[in-house]
Each structure stands twice: as C-alpha cells, then as structure tokens.
Amino acid sequence: MKKNVSLTRYLVEQQRVDGLIPGQLRLLLEVVARACKRISQSVNKGAIGDVLGTAGSENVQGEVQKKLDIIANEVLIEANEWGGHLAAMASEEMEGIYLVPNRYPHGEYLLMFDPLDGSSNIDVNVSIGTIFSVLKKPEGHPGVTEQDFMQPGTQQVAAGYCIYGPQTTLVLTVGDGVSMFTLDREQGSFVLVQENIRIPEDTKEFAINMSNMRHWDTPVKRYVDECLAGVEGPRGKDFNMRWIASMVADVHRIMTRGGIFMYPWDRREPNKPGKLRLMYEANPMAWLVEQAGGAATNGKQRILDIQPTQLHERVSVILGSKNEVEKVTQYHSEA
C-alpha cells in the first residue's frame, strides 16, 4: 500500500485505472467526506460549541432528536444539494425525500444517510458516526419520487460510514473491497490507512444488548446461551460480549478484528420486523461487511436481497464474521 494517499487521490486512481467510479460518483463521495469533516468538528467541540443535549423535537420515528442530529443532517444536505451530482436525498431524520432545488443542477444519484448514528452516546463522549448509501436514480421518467429509492441493497453503487472517535475514520466501498481512511487534521484530508479489509470468518466476540434477552426469539436466545456456556458448552470456546449502543462503533470493531453484531426482532414491538432502518443503516453496513468477507442477514434472508417497500422500513440485523452469522441463520431455519 502506498503511503500518504489522500482520499481524493485514491478515488481518482479508482476512476482512472480501474474504471470503478464514474466521475460524478467520485465527486459525490468527496463532498460526503467533506461534510463528515465538518460534522467531526462539531462533535469535537462538544459543550464548547453548545451542541450537546436535546433539540426539543422528535424525528419521524418519534425519537427525541439531539442538537447534533439536526446539525449533522443540515450539514449533509447543504454540502450535497448544490454540486450537481444528486437528484435527491433521504435521511433517517426526515419524513420524506429531499429533492435537489431547481436552482441547482441535478445529477443521477440518490443519497441516503443516517446523519448521526448512536446519538444517545453524544453527551457521554462515546464514539458515534455517519452512515451513508448511494443509489442510481432509475431511468425512464423525469423527476424523482419516493419509489425511486425502493431498491434492494444489491443496487448500491457506494456505501460507507465515518466514525467520530479517538480518530475520525472513513470506511468506504464502491463494490471492490473495503478501504479505510483516517482524517489527518494537520493535512486537512482523509488519508488511506488500510485497503482490502477482511473480517475473520470465525470469532469469539458477540455484540448484543443483553438486557433485552427476555424479549428475543428462540433462535437468538439459543445462540447467545451457547456463547455464554463457554468452553464447556456446545461451541467449545469462551466468548466475550461487547455492546456500545452505537452501530457504527460496534461494526467498526468487527471490521477491525472480527465479531458478530445482532439487533434482533423482539416481542415488545411484535409488528415491527426490527429496530434498525433498512435503507440508512442495514443496507450500507451489510454491503460493507460482505465486501470485507463477512455476512449480513435478518436471521432468515440476506439483507441486501430485501426489497424495501417504504422509506423508513425497519429490519432485524445479524452481521459480521461469516461462520457465526451462518450459525444464527441456521438456528432460525431450524426453529
């Protein structure tokens, strides 16, 4: 791997040498990265910048919005609306789609994002992040409708996340493996630190909110019980449990050293298939994980094959090290 390769140079080389990234997509990804730098600056200021605490409003899901939720959402919209790369955007924080205003040129891409994942951790200074996904606008009709966003995850042309932790790190795929970039604040740009990330097929770490165990379905309970049984149990090895309550942070750990992340269906909301959003969280993370050699399902079906029917559709998520995800999926099929 070459040293000190900036994100811009990396994307240009991907476009020039490999032909993987069309010019407009390259420019779009650079704009998203710049927006993430701005969000990182706001996160870093914390109380000094008066960005902590709640905003006194709720999002479309009925969740209390943090000030930084709104700031991050506005940053992403303002950064991306005028560049000519997009036709429309959709955000976890907005009820409907956001059409690029007519005063700006329109592009061929659709951008979806969770502007600040894990925002319950903002005030306690735990890692949070931005998740994004890019689709191509379907051809054959003028304008953009919500239906244009109803594409399975297999149709993504780019996906990534930016984690705001001890370092600000951008993780990206355009369908040719996963690369990681760390923000060099002195240089002012993201710098390539790892290419072709691979998630180990086996692991001894699982991430799940154990306080909800009584609400889980039998297959998930079975899997976790076997992990807890340790070396004396049917798995024959001891497991560690991790849970940060920030999907970006939990998935980033899996990208770095393996593991399995589970946010399953539970009985408290039996009519909802899960908690996480398919379009803004599950699809981009599932594609990243698969591109790194892992797997991602809802327990029964590959996440990327799910056909969305609504903008804020929810889904159960089981992703990470391939053999462990297959084990949980097997238990669902046997139930």
From Swiss-Prot:
Substrate binds at residues 117-120, 209, 275. GO terms for cellular component: cytosol. Mg(2+) 2 binds at residues 114, 117, 281. Pathway: Carbohydrate biosynthesis; gluconeogenesis. InterPro entries: FBPase_C_dom (IPR044015), FBPase_class-1 (IPR000146), FBPase_N (IPR033391), FBPtase (IPR028343). The keyword Hydrolase applies. Its main location: cytoplasm. Its EC number is 3.1.3.11. Keywords: Carbohydrate metabolism, Cytoplasm, Hydrolase, Magnesium, Metal-binding. Mg(2+) 1 binds at residues 92, 114, 116. The keyword Cell inner membrane does not apply. One of its GO terms (biological process) is sucrose biosynthetic process. One of its GO terms (molecular function) is magnesium ion binding. It is found in: Cytoplasm. It catalyses: beta-D-fructose 1,6-bisphosphate + H2O = beta-D-fructose 6-phosphate + phosphate. Gene3D superfamilies: 3.40.190.80, Fructose-1,6-Bisphosphatase, subunit A, domain 1. Binds 2 magnesium ions per subunit. Its cofactor is Mg(2+). Belongs to the FBPase class 1 family. Homotetramer. This is Fructose-1,6-bisphosphatase class 1. It comes from Delftia acidovorans (strain DSM 14801 / SPH-1). The lineage of its organism: Bacteria, Pseudomonadati, Pseudomonadota, Betaproteobacteria, Burkholderiales. The gene is fbp.
